Design a protein with these regions (language model features):
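Extended, low-polarity transmembrane helix blocks
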Residues: 1-26, 53, 60, 64-147
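Solvent-exposed, well-ordered loop and adjacent helix/strand elements within mature globular domains
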Residues: 17-51
């Protein structure tokens, strides 16, 4: 029974974060660029344009209860490398500042965040995603799996 609120929470978080990025694509592009992972203008622009809508789509599928396992797997697949990049960037910024006092706009759509809080938040979202991928709760689902 806890899978339904977990599914709705995960879906709404991604809808909210995706919308905040989609409504400010230029700002999101700048934040993607700061990680210095992707090179090439076309690829950067494509990521900044498509990723927010992909997050909104997966979040909407979660809330609606359509393809829950696949959507949860995709969201976990987005969260794991993003969390790694946030950690890597925080470690690069960590000089004379205590680690948990580091703040920056990570690009998740919630503005400037403390790194320890963001890492904990992402770890919880990853765990919720894994529970939904491995779980079999079908309550309030339109279609749990596509296949």
């Amino acid at each position: 029974m806890a899978e339904v609120p977990a599914r709705w929470l995960l879906g709404l978080v991604f809808i909210w974060m995706g919308l905040s990025k989609a409504l400010q694509p230029v700002e999101f592009l700048k934040l993607v660029r700061q990680y210095d992972v992707v090179h090439g203008t076309l690829l950067l622009n494509s990521i900044a344009a498509a990723l927010p809508w992909f997050e909104i789509l997966c979040g909407g599928l979660m809330v609606a209860g359509i393809a829950v396992r696949g959507s949860a797997l995709v969201l976990a697949g987005l969260l794991v490398p993003f969390t790694w990049m946030v950690l890597h960037r925080a470690l690069a910024l960590h000089s004379n500042v205590p680690f948990c006092a580091i703040r920056f706009d990570c690009g998740c759509g919630s503005g400037e965040v403390f790194v320890c809080r963001k890492l904990l938040e992402n770890a919880i979202l990853i765990l919720v995603s894994i529970v939904l991928v491995c779980g079999r709760g079908r309550k309030c689902c339109v279609r749990y799996e596509l296949v």
